[in-house]
Amino acid sequence: MKNFKAKIITAKQNVMEKTAKRENTLEPDEMKELEKKTTETKDFLRKLTKSVEKETLSSGVSIQDGTELADNFLDYSVHVRDNQSDLVILSGILSKIGEFQAGFEDLKSKLNSSLINDVSDPLKSIIKTELKQAKESKREYDRVRVAFDAHLSELANLRKQKNVKPPKIQESEEECERLRTNFERVGIDTTCLLRDTNVITEFETVEKLCDYLDSYHTFFQKGYRWLAQMIPDIYEYRLYVEKRKAELEKSKVRISMMVSPQKQQADSLSKTKCFGEDLSVLLNREGSTLPWFIVRAFQAIRNHIATEEGLFRLSGTKRIIYEYKQKIDEGKEYNLSEILDIHVVCNLVKLYLRELQPEPLLTYSRYNELIDTCNIEDQNQRVDKISKILSSLPKHYYTLLHHLIHLLSQIASQPKSKMGPANLATVIGPNILICQTDVVLEDIALGNMVVTTIIQNFDRIFGGPPLLQQSVPDTYVPPPNNTRNNSVNNFNNVQPSSFSASTSRSINLNKSTNNPNINDDNNNNNNINNSDDEPYDPNAPPIYSGVPMRGNIKHSDSCSTLGDSFDEGDAVELSD
């Protein structure tokens, strides 16, 4: 009967607490805070594990589609191999891409398994064990606390009543004391358990989240390793395509020689080509120390330095880029300052630098030397070493580099552009510092570090900006009657009326750069000949002494350049 009555009292007390008719005064604030933290952790971990499982399910559908794509590549490769034996290259690249795609989907499958086995399942186990045990312990604590509180209320009521026998009050007091002892013991145990559970859950969660990152690290690392192994094959395939294209162009030239207008057009193009042209040949033809296209492009970009964001990072309209590239290469009239989107001009400059012949701007032979400077810990010694390496560049290469880095340093100094030295190095570096052999992924970051250092230390390396010596109109107008050679060689004698009505701008054309360290003795063959006594011979071989020439790089239909695939929303401010 006593037990039944005690249960009635406890149930009544429990109902009163839940209906807010009686405040919970026995439970300490620490216990309430520990319970709240445990409950929140459990809820968030449940949401997290469900999201991981949902992501792996959707990724599984993508894996099925990717596997089907890989099978199609391989089937096409087998068909070409069996039925078109002359298309060995096509069959080979189809096979390699199919194998890569299949391996990539297998990597994605392993990633999903890792996310489930190493992340989701262990977190679910924490919910079902530690957190569940803590919840049950707190439930037992609440049961003991409510029983103790109910008997305290009952004892208080007995003491208020009259004609209650002392033995009954004494019995109630003894019961309350027993419940108090039990309540304190259970309270200590529950508090310790909740503390331990929260700590263990934190450690376990951090560990599993590290496993989450490790899974993705393994995924991307293996993917990059596969791509790095395929890069030499990609170069071989591209060289094959370029060779076949060249053979096709030769056959077209032989046919076009039979038709006078087409022959004249081909001859005209060879006299006006800018992109992919040997720099010494181009400068000799134009009679200048800096390509006229670069002069106009740099001036147009300078007009936007203080107002435009993302110069050299954001992409222009690819159709417009291609149209202006054609105009410049074909010697047609153009005006870069009239282009509304300055990013088109920036993309044209990157495209020109990427296709520079016969070598990239920082040359193949100096690539390893520049990369090795990253191992120099002392900043001053590193800058001095880079300066010494750059001073050994051919004179016409050094002049172009001087003007380019001057422009980049001006952009980096403008907060509005949001293009610090590191940002600029990321998008410009791969176009001027290129390895002649296999690409080493680790060297890309080191190369960007070198270019960042050059931009940051422009004044120290180059001794200041180039001198202002000549001016050039905004608009390029082709000379009349196809007498380009004579007109270009006598460019300084052309009257202003020969150009479209636009303001002439002052440009940087330093024929003898102000860095005294340039080695003229090693570059005598690269000096620009402006004499009318020695006209430019388009059939003469490129005048260059140094490392072997690199293969021509043709523009793609998309006219994209390295670094142009960024969307504006993807832009991040890199640390300088």
Swiss-Prot record:
Residues 501-513 have a biased composition (Polar residues). One of its GO terms (biological process) is small GTPase-mediated signal transduction. Rho GTPase-activating protein involved in the signal transduction pathway. Transmembrane segments: none annotated. Residues 277-462 form the Rho-GAP domain. This is Rho GTPase-activating protein gacP. PROSITE patterns: RHOGAP. It is found in: Cytoplasm. GO terms for molecular function: GTPase activator activity. The keyword Cell division does not apply. The record marks 313 as: Arginine finger. The gene is gacP. Keywords: Coiled coil, Cytoplasm, GTPase activation. Residues 482-500, 514-530 have a biased composition (Low complexity). It comes from the Eukaryota. It comes from Dictyostelium discoideum (Social amoeba). Residues 472-576 are annotated as: Disordered. Residues 565-576 have a biased composition (Acidic residues). GO terms for cellular component: cytoplasm; plasma membrane. SMART domains: RhoGAP (SM00324). PANTHER family: RHO GTPASE-ACTIVATING PROTEIN GACP, RHO/RAC/CDC GTPASE-ACTIVATING PROTEIN. Residues 123-189 form a coiled coil.
